[in-house]
Each structure stands twice: as structure tokens, then as C-alpha cells.
Curated annotation (Swiss-Prot):
Pathway: Carbohydrate degradation; glycolysis; pyruvate from D-glyceraldehyde 3-phosphate: step 4/5. PROSITE patterns: ENOLASE (PS00164). Mg(2+) binds at residues 242, 288, 315. Its cofactor is Mg(2+). It is an enzyme of class 4 (lyase). This is Enolase. One of its GO terms (biological process) is glycolytic process. One of its GO terms (molecular function) is magnesium ion binding. Binds a second Mg(2+) ion via substrate during catalysis. Covalent binding to the substrate (probably 2-PG) at Lys-340 of a small fraction of enolase causes inactivation of the enzyme, and possibly serves as a signal for the export of the protein. It catalyses: (2R)-2-phosphoglycerate = phosphoenolpyruvate + H2O.
Amino acid sequence: MSIITDIYAREVLDSRGNPTIEVEVYTESGAFGRGMVPSGASTGEYEAVELRDGDKARYLGKGVTKAVDNVNNIIAEAIIGYDVRDQMAIDKAMIDLDGTPNKGKLGANAILGVSIAVARAAADYLEVPLYHYLGGFNTKVLPTPMMNIINGGSHADNSIDFQEFMIMPVGAPTFKEALRMGAEVFHALASILKGRGLATSVGDEGGFAPNLGSNEEGFEVIIEAIEKAGYVPGKDVVLAMDAASSEFYDKEKGVYVLADSGEGEKTTEEMIAFYEELVSKYPIISIEDGLDENDWDGFKKLTEVLGDKVQLVGDDLFVTNTTKLAEGIEKGIANSILIKVNQIGTLTETFEAIEMAKEAGYTAVVSHRSGETEDSTISDIAVATNAGQIKTGSLSRTDRIAKYNQLLRIEDQLGDVAEYKGLKSFYNLKNK
């Protein structure tokens, strides 16, 4: 009864109006699962391949009919007949079927859509929530959210180089209260920006995209918003950032070009000094992709300087890849990994990366992409793995709110068992 009888994929749209893939899996018993695949704007050089059609006459070349056909004609033939509960075997079969190191033949988007849909169908078959199916009955930790309330870089058309300025409500007793605190700071920020005559339009991830005078002004205005909302910066709410430095690194010159803000060129050493200065002035607890994805020597220096007191997250640096992560762990680079399911392409490999990080004392931050859908699987993954942190955008746009609302449901379902760890989520820091 748990045997897969049908797999079907179709082309749908993501939050940016670009095509993405949706996959449905059916079993003999009538159990059903659906998975939708996100897409990034700033992508790491070593990410698994997102297969696009390249036909400029259709969706400007961004169609995914090739990926859809690969699911319907190749993957389906190989996977139909499997027990839907055998996630690892199904994921491995798809990896072997693709046969490339980066899933470039079938497309990571095709493979991931099936992987998610299979997990959801298995949970439906067993009549348990997805987070319980994926994590067993020790799933209890609600993640501390990184809420991206100011967007810059590749996520907005403004004068800010850094891609994300985030708040983390570490002083909240529950996820529900953390979400409320974040929403109140978000609305306070809207009021402040409006009062200054600045735009309150939002970027890809639902954060505001104002034309501020400098990158540092992003932190200043958020501190003001935290206080306006009635909270204490550094105690109730701390700051996090995603520099996405690979996006403004000039490979030919070997320097970081802060062109949007007009702050000029900086060497690796100057960037590290800049981060040191920011951390000394503002309650910044997490910096993601502070340096270019290939600047491993620089990352090692950054880790030596700030690694005891600041979470240094590798996104483009590690691309949710256990081989890259293992190398980083061995070399003492960063102390955290960003987990994006579509960077690697299967749930099995995603869980392996999270487990490897935890074993090494690195944190794992489960993350959305800038091009999202209403699929809320990452919320279940965050709880299933007790990861402790999630990054899923701002307090606007339904594609972001869908993840927060799912976490509210999960916390409600868990009842007294649910834990919200706040500052304790940063077990990788010696000096919090």
C-alpha cells in the first residue's frame, strides 16, 4: 500500500514570477505528497545545477520544461515501484540516475521536487506531521528566526551593498512571541523610514529596500526600530547580516568593491577590520558570507578574529555540500553552515550536511531562497533536525509568512514539549 504508483511534475511560478517545478507523488493507498522548488538570486559557484530551458522566446529563457520532462519521463520510470518510506534509497537512486557530481544532467530542481514530494507522501501515508516523519519523536526545538527586514545587494535596487540586514528575537520565551516581536520591529521600521521620506517598498524577501547613506546606516535604523518597538537591542533582539560578499568581489583586482554605497574598494584585511568595527558598535551576532566564497585564507583570518563571539555562516562558501563543509571544518573556517535544500538537491544530502555540522560544533541555519513558493517544507526540516535557527525572510509577502505560519502550527501541535532556545541556539560561540 505504500508503493509509489505515480509521479507527476508541472511548471509553476515562484515569488518572482519565474518558472519553477512542482512535483506530486502518489501511492497505492492514495497517500499524496507535493513538493515545490525554490530558486536563488545570488548563487554560489559550486551549487548543484538548476536546470533551465534557455529558450529566450519563453519566460526569457527561464522555463523549466526540461526539468519537468526529466521527472515525468526519466525519474518517474525509475522511482515508481519504490516504497515511499524509503527516502534514502529513492534519493540515492536519483543521484545515481543523474550520474554527475552537480546533478547537471537531470537538474537539482527536478530531483529535489521529487525528494520533497516523496517525504510528504510518506508522512501522509503514515498519518504523521512531516516534521515528525523526518525527525522522529525527539523533534521539539522551534528555530530562532533570522528576519531580513532591510534588503540590499542582489535582492534590491538600492544603495546598500550588503544583501540582508536581519533581526533575531533571542529574548523571546516562545516562537510565537519571537514572531510577534519581529513583526512589531518591522512595523516600527516602516514608520521610521516613512517619517524620513524613504521608500517602504519591499525586496525579494519582504524586507524594506530604502536608499540609505551607507551600509552602516542599515544597522543604525534597525537599532532605532528595535527601541521604538519597546525592546532592548542586544538583549531582546540582536542583529545578523548576510554580506553576500561574492556578489561585490572583483576577482581580477582581488578586492571587495562597495559600489552601491559608494564606500569604495577594500582588501580582505580591510573587510575583516570593517566587520570588527561593526561588531564593536552594534549587537551583531551573525555574519553570513563575510568574504568571497573562494577567499578561504581570508575566511580563516576572519574566523580567528571573530569566531569566538560571532556566528560566521558559510552559504556560498559551503553550498550545503558535505565535501566543502568537511574541508572547512578541517581548516577551521567559519563556525556555521547555511542549509538550502536546492543547493544540494535531496533531503538525504541536506540532513547529512546538518548532521556533519552539529558533530563538528558548527550551527546549521535552515534557509529559504529569494525566489520562493508557498511550500513550507523548510519549517518542518528546521524542527525535524532541532537545528535551532531558520532564515526565511521578513514579516511580509505570503511566500515568507507561509514558513512562519507553519512554525506557529508546529509549536501549537507540540504543546508543552516545544522549546524555543533563543540565544542558546548559538552553541558555537564561546563568548556570547
